[in-house]
């Protein structure tokens, strides 16, 4: 079938586009990890296989932002979204209290802008 022939070509054909994409993702991963680790109190290890990072934001738990106590990462994620329009995923939903998921499946420019916004949001906590 045409699907099988396309699959064979994808597996056995030129892999340069795969290598280029891998390099691009590694570059963006390193960028977001560096920018997150520059935020006060945030610890972000580099992931090995995903296109998202899962930094520890527990430093900001039980602090107040805009008159609201940040009890968990649902509160932190909601605060970041409301304050600076950056979407994150709370780690509490994955059983990982204190962590927030950020995707880096976007451009370096958007990552830089988003992390700058998050930095500004955290200044008032």
Question: Model-found features: residue ranges?
Answer:
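PLP-dependent class I/II
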Residues: 1-125
């Amino acid at each position: 079938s045409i699907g099988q022939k396309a699959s064979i070509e994808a597996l056995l054909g030129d892999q340069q586009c795969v290598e280029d994409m891998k390099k691009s993702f590694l570059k963006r991963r390193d960028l977001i990890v560096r920018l997150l680790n520059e935020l006060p109190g945030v610890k972000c290890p580099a992931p090995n296989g995903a296109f998202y990072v899962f930094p520890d934001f527990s430093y900001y738990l039980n602090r107040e932002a805009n008159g609201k106590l940040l009890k968990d990462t649902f509160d932190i994620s909601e605060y970041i979204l409301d304050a600076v329009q950056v979407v994150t995923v709370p780690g509490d939903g994955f059983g990982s209290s204190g962590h927030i998921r950020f995707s880096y499946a976007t451009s370096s420019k958007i990552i830089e802008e988003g992390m700058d916004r998050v930095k500004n949001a955290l200044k008032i906590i």
